[in-house]
């Protein structure tokens, strides 16, 4: 069985661990400390809102198609039978694509080492001119990534990649009928569908040339006679140790593959904008005729992408309502704890399996064939309950401070008719007490800092996010593409400047969030994040009150361009100061390349 992120003994939905580099943070941070703006700034509110309305982006077009898709809706009584062809048929061979003669090992080592040194830097999308020459360019994955490189809006790129991930299942149908409700199986009959995303040769390369450690980056586990064993030796996961454990029947689970694999990073960085929630992943390599993990359920929405080999999966519905859409992962279950599976199937390369939080699952390799799959995970602790858990204490605090009814004393004799021992009492005083509680609870909604808590959750998402992946266009039109360099003993091509005539928009849609803290405004952003989870402290810029409406206009008008001279500021100096600061940080792009002065 393969354990998804944050299962029992598994890593939580994080991209990895590392020592943090601290950055000075704004003081007085509080979700109740909303920004204070001078009256002179508020006169721009109406004009800013009208500009946003005029610049509103067109809605995305959705496509419909026939699909070879199975869900478990309506299959509660008996498990889906394992197809006869899946029991006996040998896997169809995946065509081997010859490597270019130029793709020698030293070049590959040099390229990946350079990527490792720049984990937090934006990178171009696959399909651009700097992509790995060893990747199979004609695979469906590489074709869609090349297509994304030509889509100007990051929103549309995220929607397109998710559409490709589910294809031929329409995303709108998936969200309306299946998301958080049913397990879904998509069969594609195309072993090359995910080719270029991740492979066993990629894992072998990482063991040889990257600093991979047992327990931190790689787990070795097996499930024998109803017991799971984790067999992580201390220290670095060198090939000799890792492959010896694999030969001994251990599954290898690579945590945070996006920290090592540029393609996995790029895949997740695009999809995180679709979910509005952190997207993580693990990779699982299981030897033939073995099972790595015990049956369990997880606290994330799981998308299983079968990359190599074959694997038998059994998926079970939550056993009772308390396990439905679980907020925490389960302990390991025994086979006696399980009922009949609602879905039993063999995944082959190119297939996709989705199941919600709380669905128990286990998987094993059979027929002498290994299995490699990637689990994409999202929506960990991203529920209404989690949101209200943050809102209600703050609402209570505000209500006590602002409404005298919450400060009035309890009845002197309330213990005579309240409490468990009086729960069956018909005392009218008890009825009046309960009514008073209901009235006060209903009033709490007036004090709920909903927007402030939403901003704090958005700030957390910005910190959780992977750094953005840039298209060729985004790189060429932003500071990342300026031709400034050192040449002949001095820097050259220095001097490009924004003017009031320059047209700009944000680099991407989900890369920044404006948050009020301690009476000040801060713009939190992702472009300097690491591919390793929280390796860096949150990054932010202070936005002055006279620039607040202009900043909001830039955030809300994406992907439409705004002329710098039209930003709602009090002066040209404020307009240019804000635009230049954002451009220099890599947060803005221009409609045309800047002209060197």
From Swiss-Prot:
Q: State any GO BP term from the record.
A: negative regulation of osteoblast differentiation
Q: How is the cofactor bound?
A: Binds 1 Fe(2+) ion per subunit.
- Provide the positions where the record notes the PTM Phosphoserine: 62, 65, 86
Give residue spans, biased composition: Low complexity: 49-62
Which residue ranges are recorded for the region named Disordered? 1-138
Q: Which UniProt keywords apply?
A: Acetylation, Chromatin regulator, Dioxygenase, Iron, Metal-binding, Nucleus, Oxidoreductase, Phosphoprotein, Repressor, Transcription, Transcription regulation
Location of the protein in the cell: Nucleus, Nucleolus; Nucleus, Nucleoplasm
Compositional bias of kind Basic and acidic residues: 72-81
Compositional bias segments (type: Basic residues)? 14-24, 37-48
> Where in this chain does the record put each JmjC domain?
250-395
User: Where on this chain does Fe cation bind?
Assistant: 296, 298, 361
The UniProt similarity line reads: Belongs to the ROX family. NO66 subfamily.
**The protein's name in its UniProt record:** Ribosomal oxygenase 1
Q: What phylogenetic lineage does the species belong to?
A: Eukaryota, Metazoa, Chordata, Craniata, Vertebrata
């Amino acid at each position: 069985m393969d354990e998804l992120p944050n299962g029992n003994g598994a890593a939580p939905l994080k991209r990895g661990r590392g020592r943090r580099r601290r950055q000075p943070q704004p003081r007085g941070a509080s979700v109740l400390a909303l920004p204070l703006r001078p009256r002179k700034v508020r006169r721009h509110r109406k004009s800013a809102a009208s500009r946003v309305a005029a610049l509103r982006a067109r809605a995305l077009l959705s496509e419909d198609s026939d699909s070879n898709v199975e869900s478990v809706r309506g299959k509660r009584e008996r498990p889906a039978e394992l197809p006869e062809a899946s029991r006996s048929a040998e896997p169809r061979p995946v065509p081997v694509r010859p490597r270019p003669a130029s793709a020698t090992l030293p070049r590959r080592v040099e390229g990946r080492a350079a990527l490792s040194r720049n984990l937090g830097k934006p990178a171009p999308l696959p399909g651009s001119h700097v992509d790995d020459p060893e990747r199979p360019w004609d695979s469906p994955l590489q074709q869609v990534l090349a297509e994304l490189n030509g889509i100007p809006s990051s929103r549309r790129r995220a929607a397109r990649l998710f559409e490709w991930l589910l294809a031929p299942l329409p995303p709108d149908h998936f969200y309306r009928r299946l998301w958080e409700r049913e397990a879904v199986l998509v069969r594609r009959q195309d072993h090359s569908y995910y080719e270029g995303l991740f492979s066993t040769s990629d894992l072998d390369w990482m063991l040889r040339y990257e600093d991979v450690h047992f327990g931190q980056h790689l787990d070795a586990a097996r499930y024998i006679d109803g017991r799971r064993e984790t067999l992580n030796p201390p220290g670095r996961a060198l090939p000799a140790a890792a492959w010896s454990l694999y030969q001994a029947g251990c599954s290898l689970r690579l945590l945070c593959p996006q920290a090592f694999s540029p393609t996995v990073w790029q895949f997740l960085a695009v999809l995180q904008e679709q979910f509005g929630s952190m997207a993580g992943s693990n990779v699982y390599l299981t030897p033939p005729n073995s099972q790595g993990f015990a049956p369990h359920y997880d606290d994330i929405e799981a998308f299983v992408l079968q990359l190599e080999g074959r694997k038998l999966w059994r998926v079970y519905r939550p056993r009772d309502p308390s396990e439905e859409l679980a907020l925490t992962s389960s302990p390991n279950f025994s086979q006696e704890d399980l009922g009949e599976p609602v879905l039993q199937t063999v995944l082959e390369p190119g297939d996709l399996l989705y199941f919600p939080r709380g669905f128990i699952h286990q998987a094993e390799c059979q027929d002498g064939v290994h299995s490699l799959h990637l689990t994409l995970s999202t929506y960990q602790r991203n529920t209404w309950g989690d949101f209200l858990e943050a809102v209600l204490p703050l609402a209570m605090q505000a209500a006590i401070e602002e409404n005298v009814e919450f400060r009035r004393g309890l009845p002197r004799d309330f213990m005579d008719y309240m409490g468990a021992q009086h729960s069956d009492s018909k005392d009218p005083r008890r009825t009046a007490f309960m009514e008073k509680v209901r009235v006060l609870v209903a009033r709490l909604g007036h004090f709920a800092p909903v927007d402030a808590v939403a901003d704090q959750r958005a700030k957390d998402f910005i910190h959780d996010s992977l750094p953005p992946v840039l298209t060729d266009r985004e790189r060429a039109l932003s500071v990342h593409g300026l031709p400034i360099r050192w040449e002949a003993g001095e820097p050259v091509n220095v001097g490009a400047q924004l003017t009031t005539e320059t047209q700009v928009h944000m680099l991407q849609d989900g890369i920044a969030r404006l948050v009020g803290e301690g009476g000040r405004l801060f713009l939190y952003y992702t472009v300097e994040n690491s591919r390793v989870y929280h390796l860096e402290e949150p990054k932010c810029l202070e936005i002055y009150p006279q620039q607040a409406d202009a900043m909001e206009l830039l955030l809300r008008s994406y992907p439409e361009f705004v002329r710098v001279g039209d930003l709602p500021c009090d002066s040209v100096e404020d307009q240019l100061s804000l635009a230049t600061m954002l451009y220099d940080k890599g947060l803005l792009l221009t409609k045309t390349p800047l002209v060197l002065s």
